[in-house]
Amino acid sequence: GIRDLRCLVGSEMCIRDRFLIVSDTHGRMYNLEEAMEREEFDGMIHCGDVEGMDDLIKSKVNGPCYMVMGNNDWFSNLPAEIQVNIDDYRAFITHGHNYGVSLGLEGIYAEALSRGVDIVLFGHTHRPVAEKRGNLWIVNPGSLTYPRQMGRKPSYAMLTINEEHELSVEIKYLD
């Protein structure tokens, strides 16, 4: 919805929407809570492998909280995948394991193209990715609990939409 624009001090840019994007927390809250304290955000997207913490996480988010089921969420009532609108952008949220993301991005890329979305958000690999192919953003925030990329720092992503409705994504790391 429409909300007051928050302008960054000393900057021309005004922020419309900021989403904290996380995945693969695997039942652990400590790094997620640190990321939530560190960032200002209007909503959260969790790309799966929540492992029973969905109600607790939702209770800590003051705004929309979109979550999907991962391959380790056996007894979850979360949806396997969802499509939502974030400002003017169509987002497809999935854990990614059903699209072969461990082998590469081609499967998830093809699915996102077939759905006509602007951004696809997924997890599963525990390795962060934020790349734009044409008009499509492909985003994996990595894992806050069990990072697997070089250096193995816990990671998440921030999705920002400015007052010109421009979308940007940044991968961030906890030390």
Question: Where are each of the predicted segments found?
Answer:
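Active-site neighborhood of phospho(di)ester-bond hydrolases with catalytic His/Asp-centered motifs
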Residues: 21-23, 43-49, 66-71, 93-95, ...
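N-terminal active-site segment of His-dependent metallophosphoesterases
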Residues: 11, 16-64, 73-80, 152-155, ...
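Short acidic, glycine/proline-enriched helix-loop-strand junctions
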Residues: 58-66, 131-145, 150
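Helix-adjacent hinge/juxtasegments
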Residues: 66-111, 115
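Binuclear metal-dependent phosphoesterase catalytic core
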Residues: 31, 86-87, 110-117, 139-175
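Active-site environment of divalent metal-dependent phosphoester hydrolases
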Residues: 26-30, 50-55, 72-77, 99-104, ...
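Single conserved hydrophobic/aromatic residue that forms the stacking wall/gate
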Residues: 1-15
